[in-house]
Amino acid sequence: MGLIYGDRRLRLVLIYDKNSQCDRITLIREHLPDRNTPERPSLTLDDLLGKWEGEAITIASDWLEPEVMPTITEWRQDGDRVIMSLQMQTLRGAQTITSIARLDPNNPQILHFDQDNLPIQTLFLPDGASLTCPIAIANRQPFRLSLSWLLEPKLHQRMIRTYDAKGEWTSLTLVTERKVG
């Protein structure tokens, strides 16, 4: 997965081992030659807290017309719990997805989401990036991977790839949001 912004590009390679466990993550950060593009600091939860508004563009694997929808994302912290609420206005009406995570007690750069069939983790990475992925992939279970990048203090992009129970790619969503509160 990869994102481009200005003269910078961020790519991520995620490898699961033969036991379907998340094994290796390679974050590739690039910029055009002869540019003094400063690297952004590692992403933190504090960078995300608040209200974000923008839009999501989803392309399905059948390559039909992309679906564009407005989004509102809110991040809140309550002790060691983190609540992320995503509101989207889809063709089927308003949809709200709320996810609750807990901070890893040994590493503040990791969030654990446990309410799904697959345990999910978010890893805060260098250069304002983060990865959200299953800790392990289960046979015949659909899953999502998400690469996020804080491009500027109040501008955030997220690419979400969705896979079906056969492991086939079904959709790709690009979310671009600005912090409004």
Show which residues each predicted segment covers.
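Amphipathic/hydrophobic helical signal segments and adjacent flexible N-terminal regions
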Residues: M1-P70, D78-I83, T90-Q95, R140-F143, ...
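Central antiparallel beta-sheet cores of small beta-barrel/beta-sandwich binding domains
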Residues: M1, L64-A138
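Beta-propeller and closely related beta-sheet repeat lectin domains
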Residues: L145-L147
